[in-house]
From Swiss-Prot:
Described purpose of this protein according to its UniProt entry: Plays an essential role in the initiation and regulation of chromosomal replication. ATP-DnaA binds to the origin of replication (oriC) to initiate formation of the DNA replication initiation complex once per cell cycle. Binds the DnaA box (a 9 base pair repeat at the origin) and separates the double-stranded (ds)DNA. Forms a right-handed helical filament on oriC DNA; dsDNA binds to the exterior of the filament while single-stranded (ss)DNA is stabiized in the filament's interior.
Signal peptide per UniProt: none
GO terms for MF: ATP binding; ATP hydrolysis activity; DNA replication origin binding; lipid binding
Domain note: Domain I is involved in oligomerization and binding regulators, domain II is flexibile and of varying length in different bacteria, domain III forms the AAA+ region, while domain IV binds dsDNA.
Name listed for the protein in its UniProt record: Chromosomal replication initiator protein DnaA
Coiled-coil region: none
Cited Gene3D superfamilies: 1.10.1750.10, 1.10.8.60, 3.30.300.180, P-loop containing nucleotide triphosphate hydrolases
Pfam families named among the record's database cross-references: Bac_DnaA, Bac_DnaA_C, DnaA_N, Hda_lid
Keywords: ATP-binding, Cytoplasm, DNA replication, DNA-binding, Lipid-binding, Nucleotide-binding
Length: 461
């Protein structure tokens, strides 16, 4: 009875939560009765803590509404329920394709006999230096890391396919390799293939030229996990899309893991067939956003530590506050600072960094100003520049103004009072409220999250 009640609760949660929230946190849960207690099993500690913190009140309220004083007690645990299959709904897989001898790990079938046909060294494309342990986690990539970690522990499970999207240099490729390393660690016989989308196209063209298309199909449809970077490069390549469509279907039918990355949300990829874009969203889609200040500082400190350099905190904050677009830019700047320090023998101070990065810092300071942000946001939302300074409170004007204030706090070195002055003499508390409101909306609204990420890319390019 209580398990049936949980199924009804799932329906309520699916209605109330966004598709990403439901797929990320609710779908992986498994339920089973233990006496008068309903036990919800989470796949890992991260999911357990998140559900308990964010959704336990909603779940208990639903149980009370339905059963009053007879509502079951609720307990959380980590792992899989002892019996049968998960109660939570999952995409229904078609009949698995036939395989040769397989070694079972979790819910994924691993082919241990089929030999790579196109390139026997594909597994070596998984870079062993990219691990979850050296991936710096922050609010901007927290969901992406959690999903990737779950896939590495349970490939072919609830998050299949996993689609990661975001700008260049934000850590998507690092996560792909970390998943691959995790899968291979758990099962050394697993055939894990990582590649850029252009490599898939090149292999297909070569197969066509050599009259070996069937061999091509057998190889790609025999892998246990397929990770393809920058899927947007499939745009307008009709034959490649056709072949990948069938490969995608075959792998999912066999519950074999697929992870894809792109620089944009699946539905925004031009030149890719709708049937593919629809399939990209079958599992879980997660945005990887530019790192916030604290994460940028942590990245710099970790990189300096790995290089054997003592980086003062104030220097890390100085660099992080001025370079905001992506991880690659941060690491490149730090490498330049370290190289200059090694060549000159000078200590790494703020003045030294200002000198070593003077061209890079000058470019950043020139590009990102409050005025530039206001103009860019006004153009993006199709409102008048004067509205940024006006007292109008209609949502069509107030929301873009709040976005511009939040961007000004993140992308410039101006104080809250200075930002308020630039927006028509507003109080610093108004700016603080706007920043908090936009931070909240970025978690709750896909549209706001996308708008904010697009504006950061525009302003940082």
């Amino acid at each position: 009875m209580a398990v049936s009640l949980w199924q009804q609760c799932i329906g309520r949660l699916q209605d109330e939560l966004s598709a990403q929230q439901f797929s990320m946190w609710i779908r992986p849960l498994q339920a089973e009765m233990d006496g008068d207690t309903l036990v919800l099993y989470a796949p890992n500690r991260f999911v357990l803590d998140w559900v308990r913190d964010k959704y336990i009140n909603i779940i208990n309220q639903f149980f009370t509404e339905q059963m009053g004083s007879n509502a079951p007690k609720l307990r959380f645990d980590i792992g899989s329920r002892p019996s049968a299959r998960p109660v939570a709904p999952a995409p229904v897989a078609a009949k698995p394709v036939n395989r040769q001898t397989k070694a079972q790990v979790g819910t994924t079938s691993f082919n241990t006999q089929a030999e790579p046909i196109i390139n026997p060294n594909h597994r070596s494309n998984i870079n062993p230096t990219y691990q979850f342990d050296n991936f710096v986690e922050g609010k901007s990539n927290q969901l992406g890391k959690a999903a990737a970690l779950q896939v590495s522990e349970n490939p072919g499970g609830a998050y299949n396919p996993l689609f990661l999207y975001g700008g260049t240099g934000l850590g998507k490729t690092h996560l792909l390799h970390a998943v691959g390393n995790g899968i291979i660690k758990n099962n050394p016989n697993a055939k894990v293939v990582y590649m850029h989308s252009e490599r898939f196209v090149q292999d297909m063209v070569k197969a066509l030229q050599n009259n070996a298309i069937e061999e091509f199909k057998r190889y790609y449809r025999s892998v246990d996990a397929l990770f393809i970077d920058d899927i947007q490069f499939f745009a307008n390549k009709d034959r490649s899309q056709e072949e990948f469509f069938h490969t995608f279907n075959a792998l999912l039918e066999g519950n074999h893991q697929i992870i894809l990355t792109s620089d944009r949300y699946p539905k925004e990829i031009d030149g890719v067939e709708d049937r593919l874009k629809s399939r990209f969203g079958w599992g879980l889609t997660v945005a990887i956003e530019p790192p916030e200040l604290e994460t940028r500082v942590a990245i710099l400190m970790r990189k300096a530590q790995e290089s054997g350099i003592n980086l003062p905190d104030e220097v890390a904050f100085f660099i992080a506050k001025r370079l905001r677009s992506n991880v690659r830019e941060l690491e490149g700047a730090l490498n330049r600072v370290i190289a200059n320090a090694n060549f000159t023998g000078r200590p790494i101070t703020i003045d030294f960094v200002r000198e070593a990065l003077r061209d890079l810092l000058a470019l950043q300071e020139k590009l990102v100003t409050i005025d530039n942000i206001q103009k860019t946001v006004a153009e993006y939302y199709k409102i008048k520049m004067a509205d940024m300074l006006s007292k109008r409170r209609s949502r069509s004007v107030a929301r873009p103004r709040q976005v511009a204030m939040a961007l000004s706090k993140e992308l410039t070195n101006q104080s809250l009072p200075e930002i308020g002055d630039a927006f028509g003499g507003r109080d610093h508390t108004t700016v603080l409220h706007a920043c908090r409101k936009i931070a909240q909306l970025r978690e709750e609204s896909h549209d706001i999250k996308e708008d904010y990420a697009n504006l950061i890319r525009t302003l940082s390019s």
